[in-house]
Amino acid sequence: MKYISIIIVTLLFLQCSEKNNQLNEKRITVDLEERTETSVFDLMDSITVVPLESSDSCLISTIHQIEKKNDTLYIYDMQQSSFFCYKTNGDFLFKISDKGSGPEEYQYIEHFSVSETGEIFLLEPWGNIYHYGNNGIFIQKIKLPNVLKSYNEIYVRRNSIVINSLSGDILYFSLPDGTYQSFHLYERMNIFFPLKRTSVYNDSIMNVSLFDNQIYKIGQDGLASSWAWDFKENNNSEKDIKRLTNEIEYKSGDNHNSVMTDYIGKGKPLRQFIYTSCESNRFKIALMEHDNNFLHVFHDKSNKMNRVFTRTKENTIFHTCTYSDNTFIYFNQPFVKGWRDLTCITKEVLGEKYNLYKNIIDDYDSNPVVILFHLKK
């Protein structure tokens, strides 16, 4: 009887421990005031400077969007309406340049997505998708149902397509049979756009809410709560959001040219704002605005430790990078300007690779420079 009691107590303890672990995974608690001195190399396994092959057949004007899948880079150049595919060592693979008015030609590409197998999906803002194989050969044109005001972002996983609209609506579309569901995400609130808030992790398409730090998984049944950031006293309250709504309504009626940072920080409606939330094999990451500055939050899933910092020891920020496939991707963005220091690349970060980086950016005949920050696994 004594041994049975011990077994029961042990089982109950294990069940409670498992439940606590599940709760901890559902809510990541972070003290934004507790800063950690962090080096890029505390987070990254390695850094790659990619010298994109430059020839008459593959010259890029500007990089509008870039994605990485395994050892392949996918780049859309809006100025040329062309799509380029490279190996991560810089070798050119192929180019898609099918702008026109024919049945297999696109007029304007708003966004693109690449499947797990390397198939390419180019999205027009009025609801057409141009589907290409992993060799750049055209497969089909897909006409989406007319249920969104605009079609602004596309994300593909397995046989499912998710489309985000500037209006705050979502279309979930099945590739095999064309069935679909549409859902309302949240209202666009002036300068707080419901775009660039979606990321892909493994087989899941995830979205971060505008103000309450919730991370949702997008599926055929709509939004399912997955987990949340908890910034304790720095969480935005309902009162904060109400104040934000009132100020935006007041200023919009006065032709006020406001920017996001007018509403975030000390003495302003919002205590913090997540620009991007993404997840890698090892980290859960939030790139934020807090206390009138950029802020990084890296939660290490392997040891449950948090790193909170404004800049790395090497004076780097990742807010101007794109996240894709366990990698932060930096590329020259001449149109990105601001009153803050947006430095990402320094000598301390690149070390002996800095000369290669400088040679690329100083060569006016070469393609834009791309740098890959490979996160630890």
Where are the model-predicted features located?
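Blade-loop segments of beta-propeller domains
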Residues: 53-58, 91-117, 124
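Short beta-strand elements that form the blades of beta-propeller/WD-repeat-like
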Residues: 29, 72-77, 118-124, 159-166, ...
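C-terminal motif of bacterial Sec signal peptides marking the signal peptidase cleavage site
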Residues: 14-15
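Short coil/turn segments at the loop-to-beta-strand junctions that recur within blades
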Residues: 56, 97-105, 144-150, 186-191, ...
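Repeated scaffold domains used in trafficking and secretory/extracellular systems
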Residues: 62-65, 106-111, 147-156, 190-198, ...
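Blade/loop signatures of beta-propeller domains
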Residues: 20-53
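Conserved blade-ending motifs and adjacent loop-strand segments that build the rim/top face
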Residues: 228-242, 301-325
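Beta-strand-rich domains and repeat architectures in extracellular enzymes and scaffolds
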Residues: 47-81
